[in-house]
């Protein structure tokens, strides 16, 4: 079994995913064969792994940081929330059904075998495996049968480092409180802690570090400052969208309704990186900005439920007004399905609504079907005759007159639809804006001169900068010696 270290957090969104990605790049730069692993993830921001299954987008990024192909075994259990009470369950990349609250808690012990099998496969041939926990180990109400945090750490005998987020405040209480709450067996797995997202003079927190060590007996592995490189990396948790605020006005405003079950929102990251583009995330209760040149309807884990939510917010009427003003619309995956005249779900795959009128902006209809399409694809944009690389993760089959004007060509078949005037577009492809030449042509058609940024190179550069920041701020030798 490969050497391993596990990073658990005092809560969600403390920066574990990015931290592990950065440490993966640190280890790679030091010449180690390093691999990422996350036993259980809950996210609608999924990726298609290089071996053809679904994993969390964070593990895809971590594999990139390691310089290795991504694998379903890097995230053997993925939960994709689709209602307030239930999630789609993905095991080793494949759909295994729906998991609801208490039923999933009873199911978790059975999933440990799959988790350990995947952990062994990931570790085969590796020098080091960097493991990411989920949420917080202090959620002791979920401890029985745990596969995400201490349950896994004990079962696999992997030492744990706790990560605290000082930016949100209360980091001393979070770490000391976690120490207090953890059962003795779990507490014994913790070898130390580190502080993430510090702003200002780090020396001002010296007394804080000493206090945490005094209360817990845990050693400090350092304090990570607020690193600008993080903002240039894909985010996995939608909580980051909730904190988005408008900046200085740019040449093109791209408005994105924040649907309750928004998925694969990292489709927008290449647009956010363009200097002439401002991506505005529009929260429920707010109006679509009247100065938007483009509205993007993003992917969603539940198309019908989010279409109902879109109407409840009045965004359907605002979208029609946007089009009448001459604005453009792009629907991606579930957003593409919403743009049509009708969505039918006779088998109740998404819930109790079996048939619903769409937005009517494209002359298409969608029929929900049980078979799920999960694949990486190479395509050609038929709008700009430029190559595309992306992926599909969806259920449903779409047809109709506007499909005669497809968005892209994938092998021997067409994808998506475009309205007769070219201003309404839809596609099942995720990741289209990562294609630099397509993105530049797309923006130019909207009257904006795109930058010359190579998006993939910018992500690689951000990972390198992140690794440099971690090398400078953490006791890397001490951390890696834990394994």
UniProtKB/Swiss-Prot annotation:
Record keywords, A-Z: Cobalamin biosynthesis, Glutamine amidotransferase
Residues annotated as the enzyme's active site: 333, 430
GO biological process, one term: cobalamin biosynthetic process
Pathway: Cofactor biosynthesis; adenosylcobalamin biosynthesis
Annotated GATase cobBQ-type domain residues: 251-438
PROSITE patterns with a match to the protein in the record: GATASE_COBBQ
Single GO term (MF): catalytic activity
Taxonomy, superkingdom: Bacteria
Entry-linked InterPro entries: Class_I_gatase-like, CobQ/CobB/MinD/ParA_Nub-bd_dom, CobQ_GATase1, CobQ_N, CobQ_synth, GATase_3, P-loop_NTPase
Role this protein plays: Catalyzes amidations at positions B, D, E, and G on adenosylcobyrinic A,C-diamide. NH(2) groups are provided by glutamine, and one molecule of ATP is hydrogenolyzed for each amidation.
PANTHER family for the chain: COBYRIC ACID SYNTHASE, DETHIOBIOTIN SYNTHETASE
Matching NCBIfam families: cobQ, PRK00784.1
Family: Belongs to the CobB/CobQ family. CobQ subfamily.
Protein name: Cobyric acid synthase
Source organism: Brucella suis (strain ATCC 23445 / NCTC 10510)
């Amino acid at each position: 079994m490969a050497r391993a270290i596990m990073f658990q957090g005092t809560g969600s969104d403390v920066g574990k995913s990015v931290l592990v990605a950065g440490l993966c790049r640190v280890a790679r730069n030091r010449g180690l064969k390093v691999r990422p692993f996350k036993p259980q993830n809950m996210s609608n921001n999924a990726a298609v792994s290089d071996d053809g299954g679904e994993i969390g987008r964070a593990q895809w990024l971590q594999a990139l940081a390691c310089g290795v192909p991504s694998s379903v075994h890097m995230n053997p259990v993925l939960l994709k929330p689709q209602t307030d009470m239930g999630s789609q369950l993905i095991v080793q990349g494949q759909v295994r059904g729906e998991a609801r609250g208490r039923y999933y808690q009873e199911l978790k012990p059975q999933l440990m075998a799959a988790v350990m099998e995947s952990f062994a496969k990931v570790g085969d041939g590796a020098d080091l495996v960097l493991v990411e926990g989920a949420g917080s180990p202090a959620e002791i109400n979920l401890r029985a049968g745990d596969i995400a945090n201490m349950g896994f750490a004990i079962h696999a005998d992997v030492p744990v480092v706790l990560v605290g987020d000082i930016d949100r405040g209360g980091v001393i209480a979070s770490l000391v409180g976690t120490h207090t709450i953890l059962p003795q067996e779990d507490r014994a797995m913790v070898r130390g802690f580190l502080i993430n997202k510090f702003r200002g003079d780090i020396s001002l927190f010296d007394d804080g570090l000493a206090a945490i060590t005094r209360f817990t007996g845990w050693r400090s592995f350092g304090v990570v400052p607020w690193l600008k490189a993080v903002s240039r990396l894909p985010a996995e948790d939608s909580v980051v969208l909730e904190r988005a605020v408008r900046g200085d006005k740019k040449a093109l405003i791209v408005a994105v309704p924040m649907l309750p079950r928004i998925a694969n929102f990292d489709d927008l990251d290449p647009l956010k990186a363009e200097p002439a583009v401002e991506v505005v995330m529009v929260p429920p209760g707010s109006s679509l900005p009247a100065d938007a040149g483009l509205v993007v309807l993003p992917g969603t884990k539940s198309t019908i439920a989010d279409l109902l939510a879109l109407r409840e917010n009045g965004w359907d009427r605002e979208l029609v007004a946007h089009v009448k003003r001459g604005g453009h619309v792009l629907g991606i995956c579930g957003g593409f399905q919403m743009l049509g005249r009708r969505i039918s779900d006779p088998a109740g795959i998404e819930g109790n609504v079996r048939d619903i009128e769409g937005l009517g902006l494209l002359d298409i209809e969608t029929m929900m079907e049980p078979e799920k399409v999960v694949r990486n694809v190479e395509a050609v944009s038929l709008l700009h005759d430029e190559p595309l690389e992306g992926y599909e993760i969806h259920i449903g089959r779409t047809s109709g007159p506007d499909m005669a004007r497809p968005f892209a060509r994938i092998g021997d078949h067409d994808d998506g639809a475009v309205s007769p005037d070219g201003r309404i577009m839809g596609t099942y492809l995720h990741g289209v804006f990562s294609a630099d030449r397509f993105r530049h042509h797309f923006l130019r058609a909207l009257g904006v001169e795109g930058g010359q940024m190579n998006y993939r190179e910018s992500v690689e550069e951000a990972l390198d900068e992140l690794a440099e920041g971690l090398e400078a701020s953490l006791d890397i030798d001490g951390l890696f010696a834990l394994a």
